[in-house]
Regions:
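Glycine-rich phosphate/adenosyl-contacting loop at the front of the ribokinase-like
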Residues: 1-77, 97, 101, 109-119
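Short beta-strand scaffold segments in enzyme catalytic cores
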Residues: 88-92
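A short alpha-helix-loop-beta-strand transition element characteristic
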Residues: 76-85
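Short, basic and Ser/Thr-rich N-terminal targeting/leader segments
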Residues: 84-87, 98
Length: 129
């Protein structure tokens, strides 16, 4: 099987439960993901070696995001711990004729403030297909 590297932003998704609107919700469901992270998880589920490269804050929320990847056997050894916050997006799931709504809060997230110096690209791509 292939060794595939993906790089992008992992985000914290806060979703309203039970198709509630934002204004109706008293709580949110939590999930971690993002386009490239989701690809890494899918590849791992198909038996490939996948490694996700990103930056997360060096705090408990950052570690929760990393743990969410690890539980699907996605490699996390090249995730930088830097910056101050994880990007967040809020999801109001649509219902019947009402469309879903998404609100992004990702300004100044860890990956957006990371620099090339935060990553060892030679090590990251070693053995990648």
């Amino acid at each position: 099987m292939a060794k595939v590297i993906t790089m992008g932003e992992i985000m914290l998704r806060l979703s309203t439960p039970n198709n509630e609107k934002f204004i109706q919700a008293d709580e949110f469901d939590v999930c971690y993901g993002g386009g490239e992270a989701n690809v890494a998880v899918s590849l791992a589920n198909y038996g490939h070696m996948s490694e996700f490269v990103t930056a997360v804050p060096d705090n408990e929320i950052g570690e929760c995001a990393v743990a969410a990847l690890r539980k699907y056997n996605v490699g996390t050894k090249h995730i930088a711990r830097c910056g101050e916050r994880l990007g967040i997006y809020f999801l109001e799931s649509g219902s019947a004729m009402r469309p879903s709504k998404v609100v992004y809060d990702r300004a100044h997230s860890s990956i957006s403030t990371a620099t090339e110096a935060d990553f060892d690209f030679t090590a990251i791509f070693e053995g990648a297909d």
